[in-house]
């Protein structure tokens, strides 16, 4: 007799609050059983085992005294994955090896869940996370993008800056931190100043993405779920004078409002997501 497949696995981390909790509550109301897996707690606080043999394969994990058999999992929400939280006194050579082995073990565990419905599959997410691929696909389907330069050449960056009369912002291609609040070394989207490019030798160690600065009226955050849009909007005039990135504002009154996307824009974003299979 097989266990009932009524569990929805929520893949996240211990610093994730509110959103994942709301999703868990909604799942419970609809009769499903949410199982939260904080990936950063593996391997120190999460136990996992995979048994492979001629008689069959078994995969299970235990987290916060809750036991999960993969046969119980009906669907997976891949929200966030964090690296393991390991002891600070662990020798660097062992630390890197432990992280690598732990991440690889979790990758194998995800494979055991391939029969479940994923939102979204890790392979598709990894393909879609490439910013240059995002920009190329956006162009192909008719979305407007800002003029963009990715380089580790200081002279190219200076020429780009001058060509746009200083209206340039800079960001990384990948996040240094995966939390909304970032960390002590988090880098926000920032406006480029001329003095930043006087001595840009450090660019040779780390290529960055430079983009034309577009004056903002609203900042939109769009959640897309199977053709449905859930859009939050910020009034950019509340923070544009003090910061380029809304996450840096000190305005405690900054609030999100519901927003309706223009039909043509919604259609193109829908096509954009289909291109990535999301």
For the regions a language model picked out, list residue spans one by one.
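Rossmann-like NAD(P)H-binding beta-loop-alpha module
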Residues: 141-165
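Short acidic/polar capping segments at secondary-structure boundaries
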Residues: 83, 123-126, 150-156, 174-176, ...
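General beta-strand structural signal in soluble alpha/beta enzymes
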Residues: 36-37, 118-120, 147-151, 170, ...
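Phosphate-binding site of ATP-dependent enzymes
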Residues: 27, 157-158, 163-267, 272
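Conserved N-proximal alpha/beta basic substrate-recognition cap immediately N-terminal to
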Residues: 3, 14-30, 35-144
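Extreme N-terminal starter segment of soluble prokaryotic enzymes
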Residues: 4-9
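Short, basic, helix/turn surface patches
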Residues: 59-70, 149-150, 169-182
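Short, intrinsically disordered, charge-balanced linker/junction segments flanking boundaries
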Residues: 273-278
